Swiss-Prot record:
<keyword id="KW-1015">Disulfide bond</keyword>
<dbReference type="GO" id="GO:0019871">
    <property type="term" value="F:sodium channel inhibitor activity"/>
</dbReference>
<feature type="signal peptide">
    <location>
        <begin position="1"/>
        <end position="22"/>
    </location>
</feature>
<dbReference type="InterPro" id="IPR036574">
    <property type="entry name" value="Scorpion_toxin-like_sf"/>
</dbReference>
<keyword id="KW-0528">Neurotoxin</keyword>
<feature type="disulfide bond">
    <location>
        <begin position="52"/>
        <end position="69"/>
    </location>
</feature>
<feature type="disulfide bond">
    <location>
        <begin position="39"/>
        <end position="62"/>
    </location>
</feature>
<dbReference type="GO" id="GO:0005576">
    <property type="term" value="C:extracellular region"/>
</dbReference>
<feature type="disulfide bond">
    <location>
        <begin position="48"/>
        <end position="67"/>
    </location>
</feature>
<dbReference type="InterPro" id="IPR002061">
    <property type="entry name" value="Scorpion_toxinL/defensin"/>
</dbReference>
<dbReference type="InterPro" id="IPR044062">
    <property type="entry name" value="LCN-type_CS_alpha_beta_dom"/>
</dbReference>
<dbReference type="Pfam" id="PF00537">
    <property type="entry name" value="Toxin_3"/>
</dbReference>
<keyword id="KW-0732">Signal</keyword>
<dbReference type="GO" id="GO:0090729">
    <property type="term" value="F:toxin activity"/>
</dbReference>
<protein>
    <recommendedName>
        <fullName>Neurotoxin 213</fullName>
    </recommendedName>
</protein>
<feature type="domain" description="LCN-type CS-alpha/beta">
    <location>
        <begin position="24"/>
        <end position="88"/>
    </location>
</feature>
<comment type="similarity">
    <text>Belongs to the long (3 C-C) scorpion toxin superfamily.</text>
</comment>
Length: 94
């Protein structure tokens, strides 16, 4: 019985560690006005997906009344940072 309990505990712990270390990551994007994009829970998932597209990420949704973008790196959180980092126009960004 003790072996069974230890085995179950080990499986649960390894599963919890695996789930926490393999998260997709993401960020709340920041607008031109240096504020987060607000939304209504689950009603604005399409809006948030469009916002995330502006930040170079293909998927996002409304979470805790703000848009959340999956796999949005810290480098591209701000609207203009994404364009500076990815735009090839030397006249705008020397």
């Amino acid at each position: 019985m003790l072996k069974f309990i230890l085995t179950c505990t080990s499986v649960i712990l390894f599963t919890a560690v695996e789930d926490s270390s393999c998260g997709k990551g993401g960020n709340y994007p920041i607008s031109v006005y240096e504020s987060y994009y607000g939304c209504k829970l689950k009603l604005d998932d399409g809006y948030c997906k469009n916002i995330c597209g502006l930040h170079g990420v293909s998927y996002g949704y409304c979470y805790a009344s703000y848009c959340w973008c999956e796999k949005l790196s810290d480098r591209n959180v701000r609207y203009w940072d994404y364009h500076r980092n990815n735009c090839k126009n030397d006249l705008l960004y020397p």
